[in-house]
């Protein structure tokens, strides 16, 4: 079971019989409409296999979330460029939830790179996985039972060679595969 805030029903519970493994696609920093005009084909190809979509903020317009929700249920947190319209879609500043036994937390800005993992461990002590965004720089680090993951940005790569998203599979509360995917 997945409890999920989606659309204009922020307290909605989505009960689904997910396949095993469960496929999760993670995006951040889409910055529509400046960089995201519509879902890029390489992103859509990954989303077509998703059971759940996580967006770590800087959506900028709720139409992106509506488009993503056409593929799978969406969890989203507010980014520093998101306004009341994205909040009204159901985006809190942080989120903590369970996916098939995996404790997940999401936040947009994780602070400076130095000390990030211990800082997120203190902020989300129950989490197995913390998803974050803001920097547009992919990041995947693990220590002491915590994994932190920034998917980068699919559309505003900044100083990175490619636009990226993250894809992972979950079975029985375990991350089985995590991949940063080039979507340029």
Positions of predicted regions on the chain:
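Short, conserved loop/helix-junction motifs that constitute active-site signature segments
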Residues: 68-71, 121-125, 143
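Binuclear metal-dependent phosphoesterase catalytic core
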Residues: 21, 27, 99-100, 122-126, ...
């Amino acid at each position: 079971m997945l409890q999920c805030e989606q659309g204009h029903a922020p307290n909605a519970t989505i009960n689904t019989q997910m396949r095993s493994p469960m496929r999760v696609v993670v995006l951040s920093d889409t910055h529509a409409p400046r960089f995201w005009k519509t879902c890029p084909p390489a992103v859509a190809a990954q989303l077509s296999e998703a059971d759940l979509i996580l967006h770590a903020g800087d959506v900028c317009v709720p139409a992106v979330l509506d488009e993503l929700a056409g593929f799978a249920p969406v969890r989203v947190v507010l980014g520093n460029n998101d306004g009341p319209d994205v909040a009204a879609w159901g985006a809190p500043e942080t989120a903590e939830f369970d996916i098939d036994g995996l404790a997940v937390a999401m936040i947009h800005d994780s602070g400076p790179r130095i000390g990030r993992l211990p800082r997120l461990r203190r902020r989300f002590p129950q989490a197995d996985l913390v998803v974050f965004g803001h920097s547009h720089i992919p990041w995947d680090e693990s220590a002491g039972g915590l994994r932190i993951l920034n998917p980068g940005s699919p559309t505003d790569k900044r100083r990175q060679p490619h636009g990226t998203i993250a894809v992972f599979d979950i079975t029985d509360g375990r991350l089985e595969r995590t991949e940063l995917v080039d979507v340029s």
